[in-house]
Amino acid sequence: MEPFLFCAACGMIWDKSEVETMARKTRVVRTELPAGRRVLAISDAHGNLPFFQGALKAAHYTPDDVLVLVGDLVEKGPDSLTLLRAVMELAQHNTVYCLNGNCDNLVREFAEEPGAVEDPFYDHYLKMWGDRCLLIQMGRAVGLDPRGPEDLPALREAVRKHFAPELAFLASMPEIMVTPDYLFVHGGVADEEQLEGLDAWRCMKNDDFLSQGHAFRRWCIVGHWPVTLYHPHVPSAAPLLLPDRHIASIDGGCSLKWDGQLNVLELPRTPGGDFRWYAYDGLPTAVALDGQIPSSDSVNVRWGRNVLEVLERGELLSRCRHLETGRELEVLNEYLYCDQDGVTRCEDSTDYRLEIAPGDTVSVVRRLPDRALVKKNGVTGWYFGRLGEKR
């Protein structure tokens, strides 16, 4: 048997013995959302404080609103500790429900599980994510600079000693929250009626959830799997709503995707009403001066399905063949990389041309001499017209 398990959505490698220690039952909170107040759901902030603040501003968040954080508040972002403390402070004064995601579980497991400091996973994870790891941020906050497995015992003691409030807050987060009309869970569940007996880890890390065919009576609000991974042709980070199955998937790829965003889903005030959404991507904006018709056929080369053959190298772009589809497209050179096996892959790339009208405001992902990679309403694509400054 292989000694490690690979987590597709977050790039973690889990030791099998570690997985066994986490085989506990899910914690379920059953409640009713406060009547007459706006409810906003956010998932997968991943330690990105500016995106969290920007998303709340985009949604015109006020203390009267109810905030539901659907997991993965921390890890993989530069501000995990700062964001965690900001949410702890926010929760003292406002109505905030925080759910446990697979990344939120990591620090608590490290601090509490017997044998954690001997587990090779933690050394691997800290080296993989470095400054973007909450454990590293905690260590440095108290003067430690963990670099290898020999530093883990001291790091564990420091986390236990200096971060008791943070550990308690993380430990308090349930995996599932259920109301009469909604079910909130980070990864996903197969059945909304038999929740208490479910394995907690599988609720937090449920890869490719929408492809499993589940449908619900309540609306099931999930994160974990960046929504662009569900789109084979046109990349989109906008919340993905499936009314016929009552599922809303809202992970916009914040901190993980180069064109990612943090989404805020506003729930309908009454059952059967319309959802609204807001987002923040931190990108510069510009105004399109020329119109452009959209592509009729395109490909979204996305994580996990991104093996390429480089056909011709250019100065900024390279002509590549996407091996899964056989399609040829131009890929930004800075997006190309080789994995540990020497296989050429790329960050999420596309040949899609956005539909643009003169005067449209777009987010600029990359600007090249003859084109720009831009976003409009959460959709990423190429624009070959002129861009002007936004006034």
Which ranges hold each PLM region?
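N-terminal active-site segment of His-dependent metallophosphoesterases
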Residues: F4-A86
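Active-site environment of divalent metal-dependent phosphoester hydrolases
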Residues: H46-F51, E75-P78, C103-R108, D191, ...
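Acidic, His/Gly-enriched loop-helix segments that form or flank divalent-metal centers
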Residues: R147-I247, C254-W258, T270, F275-Y280, ...
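Short, basic/aromatic beta-hairpin or loop at an interaction surface
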Residues: R276-L289, T325-V343
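SH3/SH3-like (including bacterial SH3b) beta-barrel domains
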Residues: L289-G304, L311, D339-R367
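SH3/SH3-like beta-barrel superfamily modules
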Residues: W303-L332, I356-R391
